[in-house]
């Protein structure tokens, strides 16, 4: 699958280091190699949203919007949150706005 990143996601990634950064790199490689979302490890669809999924990466949660395209799917990573703040109202509203 093709991969794209929002500015917010890139900013959060720049703050990472060590083991969690390496885990994120491994997950991104897995996403690029996958043919469909079902092949991804620790990936779940957000039930209240149509095209938003989350990937668990240690104590972080990476949220992405899946855009179905004729030639390959585009996975756009929108946000990277700590587990504790991932599902609060403010962040869920931000995801709802990105759900196209």
Language-model-detected regions and their locations in the chain:
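Arg/Lys-rich, positively charged N-terminal/basic patches that mediate binding to nucleic acids
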Residues: 1-27
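Solvent-exposed amphipathic alpha-helical surface segments
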Residues: 16, 31-34, 98
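A short, surface-exposed loop/turn module that caps and links secondary-structure elements
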Residues: 30-54
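Non-catalytic, surface-exposed connector residues within folded enzymatic/regulatory domains
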Residues: 3, 21-22, 40, 74, ...
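Enriched for short, Lys/Arg-rich terminal
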Residues: 57-61, 65-100
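Short amphipathic alpha-helical segments
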Residues: 24, 29, 74-77
